[in-house]
């Protein structure tokens, strides 16, 4: 019996071609460049690792995926990804969500069920600065922000100094601590993370990790996924930043937390039908980019960029521990706006002094960046000579 075309694609996803490539071949072109075949503008974009483009391998996985209904919990691809992520992180269950913001907000709300309650977190964290006040609107909780004394990452001492124990009738007690690892590319060391975990659990305070870029900390050798995730009651990990998937994150934790988060996800419109379409790409992202070692290459490039900047007289505002390079522009008399404008003239995209080096950044972009760095440093030394 002859296999059907669909069955052939399921067993041989590498044979899948994008529509534009098929049309190109029909028109006689030998090879077409599509949005899926190369990174395009992402190769020159240092704004964020969210600009990474999905790959042809992901497209093949999408074309070969299962198409069952996830609201009925019947899609093998979606269930398989969730179970696999739970296994990788050492948790009991996982839940696919459309974004890191949704993963964080579901995690927070799943923990906070009886107000009054407050959340303790770093003042610079994504939860505070980039999630549209979701903790207040979705969980009815107060956020207490902490600025780490060391200027890099939260410590047990920082938390102890700001925890609200709810001893007075006027208090809003701390019920949840949310950490972000890494934050701004800086890693919270595993031993300090474990101390925070032991302290919080002794206080009866739950712990959630915004691990959108936890992959980067693991790739840097700070600890394994299981090591870090063991410190928390829930963890959100993103597939669409440095890993390059088009969409999605996963929330991992206990089965009870997963079921509560799934109910909340549905209540805010996050339930999905044929979720295998995006889960298939997410699995490829983990396998090819994280397990395939591409993040380590990005880290090496980031270190090279940081070293180039420093050996030519530049300063960094944070150490380069993962894929982010923080330039001290103020020290050389440049503003973020000036960097953005000049970068655009050179075909480079920046969002400020933070450079994010993802795995699709090309050699040409690195060369242009180095030329720009020299320009910045020369002009800065002329305009703002340093004390000898």
UniProtKB/Swiss-Prot annotation:
Pfam family, any one: Beta_elim_lyase
Cellular component per GO, a single term: cytosol
Required co-factors: pyridoxal 5'-phosphate
Keywords, alphabetical: Lyase, Pyridoxal phosphate
Modified residues (N6-(pyridoxal phosphate)lysine): 241
GO molecular function, one term: L-allo-threonine aldolase activity
Domain of life per record: Eukaryota
Listed EC numbers: 4.1.2.-
Classification via NCBIfam families: GntG_guanitoxin (NF041359)
The protein, known as: Aldolase vrtJ
Species the sequence originates in: Penicillium aethiopicum
């Amino acid at each position: 019996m002859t296999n059907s075309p669909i069955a052939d694609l399921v067993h041989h996803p590498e044979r899948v071609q994008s529509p534009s490539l098929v049309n190109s071949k029909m028109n006689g072109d030998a090879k077409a460049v599509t949005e899926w075949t190369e990174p395009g503008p992402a190769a020159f974009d240092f704004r964020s690792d969210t600009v990474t483009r999905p790959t042809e391998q992901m497209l093949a996985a999408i074309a070969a995926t299962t198409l069952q209904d996830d609201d009925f919990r019947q899609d093998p691809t979606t269930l398989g990804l969730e179970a696999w992520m739970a296994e990788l992180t050492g948790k009991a269950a996982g839940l696919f969500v459309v974004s890191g913001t949704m993963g964080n907000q579901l995690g927070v709300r799943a923990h906070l069920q009886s107000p009054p309650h407050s959340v303790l977190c770093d003042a610079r964290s994504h939860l505070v600065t980039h999630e549209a006040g979701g903790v207040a609107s979705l969980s009815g909780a107060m956020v207490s922000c902490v600025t780490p004394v060391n200027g890099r990452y939260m410590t047990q001492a920082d938390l102890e100094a700001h925890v609200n124990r709810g001893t007075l009738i006027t208090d809003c007690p701390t019920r949840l601590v949310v950490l972000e690892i890494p934050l701004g590319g800086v890693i919270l060391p595993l031993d300090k993370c474990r101390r925070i975990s032991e302290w919080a659990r002794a206080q009866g305070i739950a712990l959630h990790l915004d691990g959108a870029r936890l992959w980067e900390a693991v790739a840097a050798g700070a600890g394994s996924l299981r090591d870090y995730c063991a410190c928390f009651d829930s963890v959100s990990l993103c597939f669409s930043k440095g890993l390059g998937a088009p969409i999605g994150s996963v929330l991992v934790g206990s089965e009870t937390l997963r079921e509560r988060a799934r109910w909340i996800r549905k209540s805010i419109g996050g339930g999905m039908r044929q979720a295998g379409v995006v889960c298939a790409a997410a699995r490829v992202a983990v396998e090819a980019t994280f397990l395939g070692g591409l993040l380590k290459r990005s880290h090496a490039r980031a270190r090279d960029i940081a070293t180039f900047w420093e050996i030519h007289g530049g300063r960094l505002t944070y150490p380069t521990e993962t894929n982010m390079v923080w330039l001290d522009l103020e020290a050389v008399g440049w503003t973020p706006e000036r960097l953005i404008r000049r970068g655009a003239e050179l075909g480079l995209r920046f969002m400020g002094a933070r450079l994010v080096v993802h795995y699709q950044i090309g050699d040409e972009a690195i060369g242009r960046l180095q030329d720009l760095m020299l320009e910045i440093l020369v002009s800065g030394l002329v305009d703002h000579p340093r004390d000898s």
